């Protein structure tokens, strides 16, 4: 029998030390990885609840196990809030991740060997959009589109040309490193021209979409997926959305369970429900507006300091800095910034001469720092410190000076007060 007073402390101190060290790292490092954010304590409370004990294969009202009357209410709340938040007619809250949500979409609507047209990983797409190392590139005939390297914008004429040439069963619109606004009506028109399904992966911008600050793909796409973390600021998980289409809804449900997953993670679904409720609050739009303003201000600092920002700026929460002209690598820049307690990620840029393990760029995002309370003034200062380190890469004195500034800023803006 377990006791309600059981604690990790004193039972598994090695694990607790690692957990505490990570929590401290989050407090005393500045987080600029575009896909990371901080959840509320309410989200954490749901994830740490007794719901983790309950198996609930199936869907609300149609379970394969008994005792699901309460978790049915939990999942129903999450579904209804997701639909309300994004203006969707259908929502599946069970996918364990964004990648599993994408995999379920492919399983539901494609046959092995079908052609998909997605954005190249090297140009800002995601692994699950047809990269050769991913199952999406192994199970399906993946054709890749990219950006115009002169403008840094998606070349929609190329997308259309490739669609006409290859006749894909599905066109995938979405990204992991693209800072401009996707043209969903154009994607829809191209899909209709060749008789393709349009699948939008809005994982990175879901929070902006929910706040009405980025175009909503639901009216244009046959199916939409997202993660529930990143800009949405919830637990790590996936979500599938669609407008009303009974045939597609049945296929999607069957693809998630039993097609791709067994029992849903009810504690995570509860945390998703909390996240959606938080995103429906009026203050969420102000947060997302600040995310965009902070990203735009930071991008301008890099431009003013002589760095190339891919696409010339940003419309959303992230931007890419190319270091090719400076002769620097993303790997070295990432490491130097890490020593100053600034966390970013190295990232490939268009026409990158380096390998994906080295790269010539950095991806920078503002969701996490905005959650801490950073405004434009703090983000401008932060971008300047990053440029100082890049201008003097490997200079320990510069790194130490920046680290002191970072420590002071983190102390002024704790993650959890």
Swiss-Prot record:
<comment type="pathway">
    <text>Amino-acid biosynthesis; glycine biosynthesis; glycine from L-serine: step 1/1.</text>
</comment>
<dbReference type="InterPro" id="IPR049943">
    <property type="entry name" value="Ser_HO-MeTrfase-like"/>
</dbReference>
<feature type="binding site">
    <location>
        <begin position="125"/>
        <end position="127"/>
    </location>
    <ligand>
        <name>(6S)-5,6,7,8-tetrahydrofolate</name>
    </ligand>
</feature>
<protein>
    <recommendedName>
        <fullName>Serine hydroxymethyltransferase 1</fullName>
        <ecNumber>2.1.2.1</ecNumber>
    </recommendedName>
</protein>
<keyword id="KW-0028">Amino-acid biosynthesis</keyword>
<feature type="modified residue" description="N6-(pyridoxal phosphate)lysine">
    <location>
        <position position="230"/>
    </location>
</feature>
<comment type="pathway">
    <text>One-carbon metabolism; tetrahydrofolate interconversion.</text>
</comment>
<feature type="site" description="Plays an important role in substrate specificity">
    <location>
        <position position="229"/>
    </location>
</feature>
<feature type="binding site">
    <location>
        <begin position="355"/>
        <end position="357"/>
    </location>
    <ligand>
        <name>(6S)-5,6,7,8-tetrahydrofolate</name>
    </ligand>
</feature>
<dbReference type="GO" id="GO:0019264">
    <property type="term" value="P:glycine biosynthetic process from serine"/>
</dbReference>
<dbReference type="GO" id="GO:0004372">
    <property type="term" value="F:glycine hydroxymethyltransferase activity"/>
</dbReference>
<dbReference type="InterPro" id="IPR019798">
    <property type="entry name" value="Ser_HO-MeTrfase_PLP_BS"/>
</dbReference>
<dbReference type="InterPro" id="IPR015424">
    <property type="entry name" value="PyrdxlP-dep_Trfase"/>
</dbReference>
<keyword id="KW-0663">Pyridoxal phosphate</keyword>
<keyword id="KW-0808">Transferase</keyword>
<comment type="subunit">
    <text>Homodimer.</text>
</comment>
<dbReference type="GO" id="GO:0005829">
    <property type="term" value="C:cytosol"/>
</dbReference>
<dbReference type="InterPro" id="IPR015422">
    <property type="entry name" value="PyrdxlP-dep_Trfase_small"/>
</dbReference>
<comment type="function">
    <text>Catalyzes the reversible interconversion of serine and glycine with tetrahydrofolate (THF) serving as the one-carbon carrier. This reaction serves as the major source of one-carbon groups required for the biosynthesis of purines, thymidylate, methionine, and other important biomolecules. Also exhibits THF-independent aldolase activity toward beta-hydroxyamino acids, producing glycine and aldehydes, via a retro-aldol mechanism.</text>
</comment>
<feature type="binding site">
    <location>
        <position position="121"/>
    </location>
    <ligand>
        <name>(6S)-5,6,7,8-tetrahydrofolate</name>
    </ligand>
</feature>
<dbReference type="GO" id="GO:0030170">
    <property type="term" value="F:pyridoxal phosphate binding"/>
</dbReference>
<dbReference type="Pfam" id="PF00464">
    <property type="entry name" value="SHMT"/>
</dbReference>
<keyword id="KW-0554">One-carbon metabolism</keyword>
<dbReference type="GO" id="GO:0035999">
    <property type="term" value="P:tetrahydrofolate interconversion"/>
</dbReference>
<dbReference type="InterPro" id="IPR015421">
    <property type="entry name" value="PyrdxlP-dep_Trfase_major"/>
</dbReference>
<dbReference type="InterPro" id="IPR039429">
    <property type="entry name" value="SHMT-like_dom"/>
</dbReference>
<keyword id="KW-0963">Cytoplasm</keyword>
<dbReference type="InterPro" id="IPR001085">
    <property type="entry name" value="Ser_HO-MeTrfase"/>
</dbReference>
<comment type="similarity">
    <text>Belongs to the SHMT family.</text>
</comment>
